[in-house]
Amino acid sequence: MDIARLIGALGVGSVVALGVACSSASGVENASADAAADAGTDAPVAPEAGPAVDATTDATADAPSTEFGGLPPAKPNAPASTATGLRTFAIRSLYIGETTRAGVLSATAWKSFGYNLDGKVTNSQSTDVCQRLPGALADIRSDGELGRDNSFGHNIMPVIFGLVSDPTAVQNAGLAAGSPTTLFQVSGLSMDAAQTNTGLTVDAFATGSFASIAENAGKKPTFTSADSWPVLPSATKSGTVESGAAHRSVDAWVVGGALVARFDQLPIPMLLGTATMALPLRNVVVTARVSNGALTEGTIAGVLPSADMRAAFTAAVDRVSTQFCDPNAKQDLLDLVALSADIGVDGTSLATVRCNAISLGLGFESAPVSEVKTLAPPPVPPPNLCTN
């Protein structure tokens, strides 16, 4: 893998990118071969020899930590909710990891997004965690604050930043203009900031573009109850609104106004330039706080299976930039994605298996909108810049 060529194509000058370049000297001749492990093999592998794995990172290795935290609110011992009606919220702002929630650019912003998914606090010296792909840096599995797992923000965001300047700003400008978003439709939520109940249901829908249906033609969303967002047929069970959501949390809860919902799978639309890439999340936890009629201070945390994430990048990158029309350059990019694996697809991190997923943490803000009632037409992707 020619990391130097990849960095040259991206123009990435970050410390992370330079660190990955150093790793190419540690024996990565074909990371794509090892990325066959992306598909999720749980076959045992030999534990790593010890903390001094990569000399390039050991000199600045994080000090070992035993502090645990960064967890979502636990399920309360509380009665089932008796609140009636549905409440629907659209994500209006998404924080990807290169800025704080206040919009301040920071190389460490990613550390405050996500949750401690594997129950461990990991740094470059940790050995009780899943095995890195050969060639990945020792700190590829380093956690954020309080053990928050977010390799996406730590290791992939520099690549995205090289493809799209100010990706969070681009994402949120797109949402304001009506680019695809995510809806959460909640049953059992009273909107009381002190509510504590179990037995809530949360349906999640990926939408099409706001203006893709006739009633919204020429309009931008207002992020009020006047907005009717069309949802993708794939976001429903059987291709109709009446069939219900394909992604449902049936045992959600709320603690002191903080909503917690878990999903087995949840694709999250993310804007890359003019192309929308669906983040193929699994083992997902979504939290948000009830405030002023909206769900605020939201967090989406989960894992991206490495093979699925490579496929998502493959489908999107040629529609974003001509930098990877060269098949070798594209392969370098996909290998770099694979090398970011820091966790298991099931959300655990066991020393006897190889990492086969990429942890992710995002922040969001939402606003109340109309209940789901309309399907979006099939989306039309932007042109492939490498064939047009």
Positions of predicted regions on the chain:
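Extracytosolic secretory-pathway proteins
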Residues: A61-N388
